[in-house]
């Protein structure tokens, strides 16, 4: 029956800690959120709720040029004591920033797909900003989603695909 209703099924085995993979949620926002002309109440609420629960947030953006703009946007939306930074492949301070995030000295880290694999953070939730963007391939979205819930003592979390519409893919 499944084969009749979908194009493809991807089977992902259970993780080593025997907990299921967190399932991404889709949140539709108006398109002006993605060009930073309108604040997103959803993003603001999402981050505040995570911080209240002592969780961190990785926000994936599709292009390097969006990193700095996203940080400025978030700093204007959130309180001053929240520590926000960004990292991308050619960032000279990339290792230092990732370590600070790992050490919980950064609350929100905006990043490109450079962190889609090879890193493990606990107490982590993820937003994928403009998830329908061409730079977020199906495999990239799966890898990014895999950042959440990697520890046996923190085996769940939230993943949100933020978009202005649901694409056919």
Which stretches of residues belong to each language-model region?
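Interdomain hinge/linker at the junction between the two RecA-like core domains of SF2 helicases
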Residues: 2-46
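Conserved strand-helix element at the start of the C-terminal RecA-like helicase core
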Residues: 49-74
């Amino acid at each position: 029956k499944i084969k009749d209703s979908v194009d493809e099924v991807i089977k992902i085995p259970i993780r080593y800690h025997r907990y299921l993979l967190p399932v991404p949620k889709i949140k539709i926002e108006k398109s002006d959120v993605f060009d930073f002309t309108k604040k997103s109440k959803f993003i603001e609420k999402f981050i505040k709720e995570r911080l209240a629960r002592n969780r961190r947030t990785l926000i994936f953006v599709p292009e390097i040029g969006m990193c700095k703009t996203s940080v400025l946007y978030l700093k204007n939306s959130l309180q001053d004591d929240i520590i926000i930074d960004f990292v991308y492949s050619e960032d000279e301070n990339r290792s230092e920033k990732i370590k600070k995030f790992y050490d919980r000295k950064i609350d929100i880290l905006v990043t490109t797909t450079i962190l889609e694999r090879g890193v493990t953070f606990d107490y982590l939730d993820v937003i994928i900003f403009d998830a329908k963007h061409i730079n977020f391939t199906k495999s990239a979205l799966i890898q990014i989603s895999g950042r959440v819930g990697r520890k046996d003592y923190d085996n769940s979390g939230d993943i949100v695909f933020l978009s202005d519409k649901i694409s056919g893919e």
